[in-house]
Amino acid sequence: MLLLTILPASLMAAMLGGYFTWMQLSELQSQLLQRGEMIAQDLAPLAANALGRKDKVLLSRIATQTLEQTDVRAVSFLDTDRTVLAHAGPTMISPSPIGSGSQLLSSTGTDATRYLLPVFGSQRHLTSPIIPAEADTLLGWVELEISHNGTLLRGYRSLFASLLLILTGLAFTATLAVRMSRTINGPMSQIKQAVSQLKDGNLETRLPPLGSRELDELASGINRMAATLQNAQEELQLSIDQATEDVRQNLETIEIQNIELDLARKEALEASRIKSEFLANMSHEIRTPLNGILGFTHLLQKSELTPRQFDYLGTIEKSADNLLSIINEILDFSKIEAGKLVLDNIPFNLRDLLQDTLTILAPAAHAKQLELVSLVYRDTPLALSGDPLRLRQILTNLVSNAIKFTREGTIVARAMLEDETEEHAQLRISVQDTGIGLSSQDVRALFQAFSQADNSLSRQPGGTGLGLVISKRLIEQMGGEIGVDSTPGEGSEFWISLKLPKAREDKEESLNIPLGGLRAAVLEHHDLARQALEHQLEDCGLQTIVFNNLENLLNGVTAAHETPAAIDLAVLGVTALEISPERLRQHIWDLENLNCKVMVLCPTTEHALFQLAVHDVYTQLQAKPACTRKLQKALSELIAPRAVRADIGPPLSSRAPRVLCVDDNPANLLLVQTLLEDMGAEVVAVEGGYAAVNAVQQEAFDLVLMDVQMPGMDGRQATEAIRAWEAERNQSSLPIVALTAHAMANEKRSLLQSGMDDYLTKPISERQLAQVVLKWTGLALRNPAPERQNEALEVHVGPLVLDHEEGLRLAAGKADLAADMLAMLLASLDADREAIRVARANQDVHALIERIHRLHGATRYCGVPQLRSACQRAETLLKQNAPHTEEALNDLDKAIIRLEAEARVMA
């Protein structure tokens, strides 16, 4: 209380006292300066005559008299050049004023103020008449110094008086405050104690009257508050008791609900397990008859058929393949939903992946007269790591949808770099079409399961509606995102943004081609296709010159002929609507007469049509959209053809493998047996696991093909029994390969854990059977196609070097696609052979296996059974560190040479 009273009063007194003291000091200082100016002004006329006469005695007397005035410290009279004529008082301590002229100058220091005033002839009028000629003549200077000491002393006295008054007032205020605090502190202490007791829960506490009206009102308010709190507490306690009773009654209900929730959770888990098991069983049940349908369809296609029957079989095969793709989509979706889809992380080439995808889908686009274009920006890293199979699946889905929903125009696939670090690359891959477009409502429902933009009964494009959902889930699992920008009636652009780690650049993949510095004329009427083609040719080292029609191109080549700027190549992108094969053949003849090599790019659907226009189909005719690697190889061959080497090698194996086939389904068993026997294998077929175990114990086999799901003893149990029997006799393990229709990852892992060495997923093709036999036995099977004879009636022993029928079958009956796949393989053979040679010279087994495995993968999609078998055998022996590895590698080298030679002959 005392502090609250004294502190504001003290602050106010200090502020007012300080303010008035400062005002008084300022006033005294101002008066002092004015007195100094007045004294200086008065001295000027008094000393004017003396200064004019240079009368030092008179000037000294005036100066001495001036010192008698208050606060005057020193006086000086100066000549015109400021030489001292007379001085009185101590030495001046203030700095001399700076300046000149007719005005009074002053300079203020800490203890004194110094004045300097010029004296002119006009100031003599006080003692003598004014002489006009001397009115403006400078007679001298009056210098005066005024001391601040007197002023400061008066200021200190005023300050002391102010402080004395302030202290007196504060003492009086403190006395009053003490008396008032004594009358307030007692009641306040009582209030404080009462509030403290209320805080501690003593709500019965009440305050008595405190002696004043205000305090009594405060006490009354506190008492009412205490009574209210007491009543509220009693009501709260009653509520708590009631709530406790309610909780006690509800505990049993909550416990029952928890039990029900636990049961529901177990039921949900069981339902999920049953769903997964159902999908696996359905996969088996559907794939098993599909295996028979596809297998026997292939067998029927080898027999003598009428054209109509062959078409019927093609329809059956296509329908079965479509059904299989639908099943695969549903199973992929189920695996993603269950979180069981595992992504690979292997190196791949982005440009090859994108262009290969477009190559596979080109026939469908060209059948609708659509233009397919791939643009890979040059700053985009090509060597990346990830899951190329799943990325290809996503791109295939996006491009397929674009083809499906585009009636005319262009489909452009772009790959560009968004951001880059030393280790990673942020990519944006987009597929843009000129199709029907999507509304905002369609876009919102686009990435939902079993949903399509048009779900009406009259919709034309088909599908399960799972493709985009699977793509979205895959991209999200890769850590990226997928989206679409679309305008109804104008088209759509589906894009994916994905961050992938960079891979080591494979220097061996770069082709050493003699194209650097050559000039190429380019003709392509489609703007984007022309831009993509220009980039590809420039990446090959060519200098490009673009022409807008074939006549201008021919004129340009003619004009440049026999000049330093001659054009070496002409790359023509044409369609049957733009030029006929006969007319094109004439232009090619004219260009070749000008020493200009010609390459023709045409749609896959018109490949057979334009074969008549070129001399060398292999090097001169390529399908749109052109693949960079394939284009490089073809251009290199066109500029510098290689010598043909046709070494004929020995057969790859000396005896037929002996295979045990086990399956409870007679149709599947007959199919596998027939396929193997047609390829030259000795087959023993049994139904059931018990029969398989007995057969292994009684006969010797090179390989066992074991069905997994069989009654009685299934494939796993039979494998475990065989392994136990082998362990008892210390025998080497017989290779056992599972034939399964299950596609779940955990199913495949459990098969390998049960003792099986490998697995094949139904439906099974001849190629898969031949590969697995070669992989686990080292014995190559004969190609099942009918034997052919060349012009010399040479009979092929073992697998054929080049089997067009098999290539056509692997390409789903599409001749153009089969030719493109074969051309892609042939384009990479030189680089693969050189890489294998370098790896053998360096004894780098890892690089050797990697390169052969890559070549082996490429042969799986082409009708080159002999090279495929050689790759399989070499890879198997290398992995097993077998003694016949060098022989297998030599056979592989000869197989490559034979394939190149036969390709040249067939072309």
Swiss-Prot record:
Taxonomy of the source species: Bacteria, Pseudomonadati, Pseudomonadota, Gammaproteobacteria, Pseudomonadales
Domain spans labelled Response regulatory: 658-777
An example molecular function term from Gene Ontology annotations: ATP binding
Phosphohistidine, modified sites: H284, H853
Principal location: membrane
Domain of life (superkingdom): Bacteria
Gene Ontology cellular component annotations, sorted alphabetically: plasma membrane
Reaction catalysis annotation: ATP + protein L-histidine = ADP + protein N-phospho-L-histidine
Residue ranges constituting the Histidine kinase domain according to the UniProt record: 281-502
InterPro entries named among the record's database cross-references: CheY-like_superfamily, HAMP_dom, HATPase_C_sf, His_kinase_dom, HisK_dim/P_dom, HisK_dim/P_sf, Histidine_kinase_BarA_N, HPT_dom_sf
Name of the molecule in the record: Sensor protein GacS
Source species: Pseudomonas syringae pv. syringae
Membrane topology term: Multi-pass membrane protein
